[in-house]
Amino acid sequence: MDLNAKQMTSEEFSKLIENQGVMGKSNITFVIGGSLGLSQAVIKRENYKVCFSKMTFPHQLFRIMLLEQVYRAFRIMKNEPYHK
């Protein structure tokens, strides 16, 4: 997660995750940056950047927000209803 990355809708996030599976990637790792961002060592290893918000959130809260968005992404992929 990176403040300078693209912000996306739930549908776009779902498509991003779906495309990773289509490309044969069975594991996705999410890295949540701290208030000072990410180290260069982490940045060099990234494949894609996502920004959820320009606001700062506590890590515990953001982990739940990320989990909810991943859940929502899979609901969208299966064309199942989800709360908007």
UniProtKB/Swiss-Prot annotation:
Enzyme class, broadest EC rank: transferase
GO molecular function: methyltransferase activity
Alphabetized UniProt keyword annotations: Cytoplasm, Methyltransferase, rRNA processing, S-adenosyl-L-methionine, Transferase
Highest taxon in the source lineage: Bacteria
One Gene Ontology cellular component: cytoplasm
Family classification: Belongs to the RNA methyltransferase RlmH family.
Catalysed reactions listed for this entry: pseudouridine(1915) in 23S rRNA + S-adenosyl-L-methionine = N(3)-methylpseudouridine(1915) in 23S rRNA + S-adenosyl-L-homocysteine + H(+)
Function description: Specifically methylates the pseudouridine at position 1915 (m3Psi1915) in 23S rRNA.
Listed EC numbers: 2.1.1.177
Localization, UniProt: Cytoplasm
Protein name: Putative ribosomal RNA large subunit methyltransferase H 2
Xref: InterPro entries: Alpha/beta_knot_MTases (IPR029028), RlmH-like (IPR003742), tRNA_m1G_MTases_N (IPR029026)
Binding residue positions for S-adenosyl-L-methionine: G33, F52, S53, K54, M55, T56, F57
Organism: Clostridium perfringens (strain SM101 / Type A)
Pfam family, one: SPOUT_MTase
Gene Ontology annotations of biological process type: methylation; rRNA processing
Quaternary state and interactors: Homodimer.
Keyword flag rRNA processing: yes
